[in-house]
């Protein structure tokens, strides 16, 4: 139903579907992976009572910035996507959208996100420039370093810091525990994602943690996920979170254990499904935080 609704927008403009695909609106998994930790941080910053305006600002902000990030990512990869099986049908790779149009879409989406940030406060506005810089540089990192997933983690975690400044006007040191936890988690699940393209990436010279980790990939991913949960436990203690939060962490831990088992043969599609599965871990933690505050 969701895809049918998106495709119906072609009635408004014959190329609407091409731009929606460029913004990856047909694949909302990236929205979920960015949204859950952002909302977790917002709920904690607001002690379980975030304003509706902040919830809307950060929810729509996540959608816009993730879409913009996809546009600039495809711009950066436009010359290599056609050589990778999973990406050879992307709009830039097939010529349905031009490089100039992709840059314009990136600018429009980031501009719209910035208008939302202007509804917060000066500190959050200044922080938003860091988010823009990370979003713009991440797609190019895979040409120069084996750690592009770390840059993605930094970008995907930036909204956590912004929720605290938007809510309270300041950034407590403990918020960095949530930031580090999400960065570690992101590196883990995006390594699963990179494992789906590892053979193609080796041929075309694209770098990733999946290539760097080699045969230790799954063990390192599980270690990163465990460290992420450890940081969340520490943050939970600092923010006085209790049983429901810990239950959410337990469900997330079960998700991580299942992913480790499921990818034991490193099948490409299984690695991709493990990447998608991380959405449920993030949702479990968010629900745990919401219930922990709501049922006090």
UniProtKB/Swiss-Prot annotation:
Function: Catalyzes the prenylation of para-hydroxybenzoate (PHB) with an all-trans polyprenyl group. Mediates the second step in the final reaction sequence of ubiquinone-8 (UQ-8) biosynthesis, which is the condensation of the polyisoprenoid side chain with PHB, generating the first membrane-bound Q intermediate 3-octaprenyl-4-hydroxybenzoate.
Major subcellular site: membrane
Short name of one Pfam family: UbiA
Organism, as annotated: Pseudomonas fluorescens (strain ATCC BAA-477 / NRRL B-23932 / Pf-5)
Any one cellular-component term (Gene Ontology): plasma membrane
Cofactor: Mg(2+)
Similarity section: Belongs to the UbiA prenyltransferase family.
Protein known as: 4-hydroxybenzoate octaprenyltransferase
Keyword Transmembrane helix appears in the UniProt entry: yes
Catalytic activity: all-trans-octaprenyl diphosphate + 4-hydroxybenzoate = 4-hydroxy-3-(all-trans-octaprenyl)benzoate + diphosphate
Gene Ontology terms, MF aspect: 4-hydroxybenzoate polyprenyltransferase activity
Enzyme Commission numbers on file: 2.5.1.39
